[in-house]
Every structure is written in structure tokens, then in C-alpha cells.
């Protein structure tokens, strides 16, 4: 009998979090997962109906206990997993705020390392080029252009067009924007 196993495409998102230490040197945030005994960049799978950028920020918060603002997108990586193929999309990012939250149970340590230490310590070779790429890129400020959500039909509204309310679909679109905007 032929192998009828279907290969699944798994999508995930993560970050390369950078900061400048008091000596002016760039540092990289890595997380340690005891289950895999690895040091890696924060990342994880998308929740249903989640934006990639929202996933990247959420996973970094959950695994490393820090809030980030995303910057320039980095090259995605792709690798085989038991269920099929996993593609992980990454963003260069920086920490916002100065508090650390408790990380989830998946990670037992999150720590800052010099670029050289991070390159030596990170377990997966395909994450090294991402660190190099993030460090080489300039700081940036994303510009997001957003058009309003779905509104009531003009024919059903007698007031000023700029005050025309969103319909049910538009309100849902607006709610879905929150994690997207929060990531930037």
C-alpha cells in the first residue's frame, strides 16, 4: 500500500530581539527550553486567525517575558518536522518597557548575550544567519497604512461620510487590528 500520509504546512513567527548594553555593545535575547535542551530565538506557532506579527510579539512575551516592538522583517526559515514542514517568519525587534513578566513553562531561562556569544550558543545553525542579518540592519520605524473597515452603505447614512459607522464586519476588522498595531 502506498504511503498516504499528508504533509502538513506549519507556520510560526518569532523575533530577533536586540538591545544596546551600557557599554554600547549589541546584545541578543535567547531563550532556553528544557524540553529540548536548546538555546534559541523566541518563536512559536500561530493561533487560529492570528496575524504573523501578532504571533511574533505574543510568543516573545510568553517565552521571554518581554514586550517588543517589531522592526524590519527578516528572512524566513523553513525546516522539516515530524508532521511536515515548518516555516518561521522573523522580525528584528526591540524591548519596550522595562519590566519583565513571568515567562511560560515552556522556557526556563531568557538571557541577553553578546552577538558572538549568541552565535556560539544558539543551538540551531539556521538561526545564526538571522542574528547576523538583524545586527547588520539599521534601526527603523515601521509605517503602517490602514484603511477604515467596512462601514454602513452610503445609501443608508444621511450624515457626514467621515462619521459613517462601521458595520458588524467593520467592527470585527477593527478588533482584529489591535494585536497587529500592538506589535508595532
Language model features by range: what are they?
Residues 23-67, 155-172:
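Conserved Nudix-box catalytic region and its N-terminal flanking loop in Nudix hydrolases
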Residues 44-134:
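Unchanged
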Residues 2-41, 143-149:
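N-terminal strand-loop-strand
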Residues 37, 77, 97, 150-153:
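Feature marks short, surface-exposed loop/turn motifs that line or immediately flank catalytic pockets
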Residues 28, 85-90, 142-143:
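Structural motif
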Residues 133-142:
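Short domain-boundary/entry signatures in modular proteins, especially
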Residues 143-184:
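Active-site-proximal alpha-helix that buttresses catalytic centers in soluble enzyme cores
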Residues 8-10, 23, 83-85, 105, ...:
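A generic fold-level signal
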Amino acid at each position: 500500500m502506498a504511503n498516504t500520509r499528508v504533509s502538513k504546512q506549519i507556520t510560526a513567527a518569532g523575533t530577533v530581539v536586540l538591545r544596546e548594553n551600557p557599554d554600547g555593545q549589541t546584545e541578543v535575547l535567547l531563550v532556553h527550553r528544557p524540553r529540548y535542551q536548546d538555546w534559541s530565538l523566541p518563536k512559536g506557532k500561530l493561533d487560529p486567525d492570528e496575524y504573523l506579527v501578532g504571533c511574533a510579539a505574543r510568543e516573545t512575551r510568553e517565552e521571554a517575558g518581554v514586550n517588543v516592538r517589531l522592526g524590519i522583517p527578516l528572512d524566513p526559515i523553513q525546516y522539516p518536522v515530524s508532521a511536515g514542514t515548518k516555516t518561521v517568519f522573523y522580525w528584528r525587534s526591540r524591548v519596550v518597557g522595562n519590566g519583565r513578566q513571568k515567562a511560560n513553562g515552556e522556557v526556563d531561562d531568557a538571557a541577553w548575550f553578546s552577538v558572538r556569544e549568541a552565535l556560539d550558543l544558539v543551538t540551531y545553525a539556521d538561526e545564526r544567519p538571522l542574528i547576523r542579518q538583524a545586527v547588520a540592519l539599521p534601526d527603523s520605524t515601521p509605517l503602517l497604512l490602514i484603511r477604515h473597515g467596512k462601514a454602513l452603505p452610503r445609501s443608508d447614512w444621511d450624515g457626514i461620510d467621515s462619521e459613517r459607522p462601521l458595520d458588524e464586519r467593520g467592527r470585527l476588522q477593527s478588533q482584529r487590528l489591535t494585536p497587529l498595531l500592538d506589535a508595532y
